[in-house]
Every structure is written in C-alpha cells, then in structure tokens.
Amino acid sequence: LVSGGGKHTHHPSINAKEVYLEAGKDYAITIKYSNLYGNAEARMLWSTPEKNKLERAVNLAEDSDVTVLVLGLNERLEGEEMRIDVEGFSKGDRTALDLPLEQRELMRALVATGKPIVLVLLNGSALAINYAQEHVPSILSAGYPGQEGGNAIADVLFGDYNPAGRLPVTYYKSVDDLPDFEDYSMKGRTYRYFEGEALYPFGYGLSYTQFSYDAIKTSGRLAADNILNVQVTVTNSGDHDGDEVVQLYLKDEVASTTRPQVQLVGFKRIHLQKGETQTVEFRLDARQFSMINDQEQLVVEPGWFTLYAGGGQPNKKQTESSVSARYKVTGKPMPIAF
C-alpha cells in the first residue's frame, strides 16, 4: 500500500504484508485511509514474495569467479524525517553506523563461500563496515552516482579508470567512538578533534598506482596582508598513470586555547603519468593560521606551526607517504579582520 502520495508529503511510505491467497478463490479487499490535506492518493500494488533470497544469492556466488556485491543506504534510510523505524535507522536518524541487518547477513553468507568479493557501497553518510574491512579484499565507495553510475563503477572495477576519490567524512568503527549526541562540544568530533583510530580517516582513498613526496619548501613571510607560499614535489612512483589529491594540513603546536590536532588548509588534484614528477604550490594567508582567543578576537598567535603534505591525513597508517616542515610565526599576536 503506497500512502502519503499527496502534495503535502514528499516521501510516500510503502506498507507491505505477506498474505496467503488460494488459487481460484475470490477475495474482498478493503482499503481505509483519511484525507487530511486534499489531493490524497492511495494505491495497492502486489508482487509474489521471493523465497530463499539468501540461498539464491549464495548459489550464484558459488557458481561465479568473482562476486560484485552492491550494498548501502538510500533516501528512506538516511533522508530527513523518513517514515521508517528499523534497527539502526529511526525516522531519518541514525542510531548505529552499520549497514542494515539483512545486508550484513548477506555479506557474511557470501564471504563464507570463499569466493572473491568486490563490495560496492552506495551511501551518502559514514558506515561502520568493520567486517568488510577484515574479510572483503576490495571496497569501492560510490556515493549516489546517478544515472551513469553503473558505467563509472564498471570503468573503475575493470581498470579502465584509475580511482582517485577521497572520503569527505570520517568512517568511525562504532557510534561508541563518538560523544553523546547532546554533548555540543567539538571534543572527539570530526578528524580535527577525534583522538581514536578511525576505520577510514577523512581524506582517505586508494589508487591503482603509488605516489611519493619530497620535502616541503616555504617562501615568503606570513603577515596580515601577505601570503606564505608552500611547495611540495610529488612523483608517480607506480606503474600506472593516475590522479593524486595532494592534501595540505596545518598543526598549531602551542596555543592559548584548544586547537585542532590538524586541519586541512588546502588540496589540489593533479594528474601524473607513471614516472612523472610535479611541484604543487599552495598559497596560505594569515586567516588559515588564525584562531579565536579567550578575548573572542581573531588572531594569529606567535609560535611554531607544522605543515604536512601527502595523499591523506598525517600520521595515519592508511597514508602511504607524507612530508612535513615547521614554520615559526614571530612577534606579537596578529589581529585578523573578521
């Protein structure tokens, strides 16, 4: 039963129940619904229940060389104020970070076949896929890729395109890693303040090739009206052409108030043929070094800062190569206009 299809409901709900109908018999069906706003709509659909779906999936996997397993979420699970209340998902809110239960059971059953699995995830928010990380050799996060998504995913899986995506959020191992929802402080939240070990950190992503980094060089003097130039040399040291997303992070070593562990201050996507080397330049202004002090002033405090450049966050086991350099700001606190 499709309900809530009127103009005031953007997301109709589908209510289903399995019933037994004997062949050759007539059945009277009554549908009752209320019309609260006008233009209400109710439709009845039917389909034959599919039995033993899990068994069928296992049989297909056992008869295949490789299984491409597509799992994930949709707008009903992670949209706003959805009419859904199942394990891990409540009316558009996430009560856990796991995949839906049926999907987790399917993945475990397919892993048990011993056949290679490529997991493709379709999702918009973070997932705790700890089991997949341990048991699935290849995972592709595809987001919600649109009508050409199938072709794009196939290009990546068959090696016609070298992937270079980077995670825009942190993938935590569990909601237990996060502060209480009613705790509004930043402590323990996002890559900037999370001190635990993430499943996949913000900025993480793999390629079919490898990249190496040379030392960071800085030039210029940071001032309220001046720019600090930062250069880093990147080499495609692998066997394939590909894109690299060069990420530049900043750490304030000593500050008068709480500062992020690191913060992203720049990134650039570059394409390098195998064996090619390129110098990437970033231009940093004083605002990117600034903070709000105890007097609620936006300032750059004097002291040491560390710059990190690499294909991901610094000091993470998932980041293959990164380099760093220290830079000292001297003088008095530098006020910055809001």
PLM regions and their residue ranges:
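C-terminal non-catalytic regions of proteins with extracellular/luminal or membrane-system context
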Residues: L1-F338
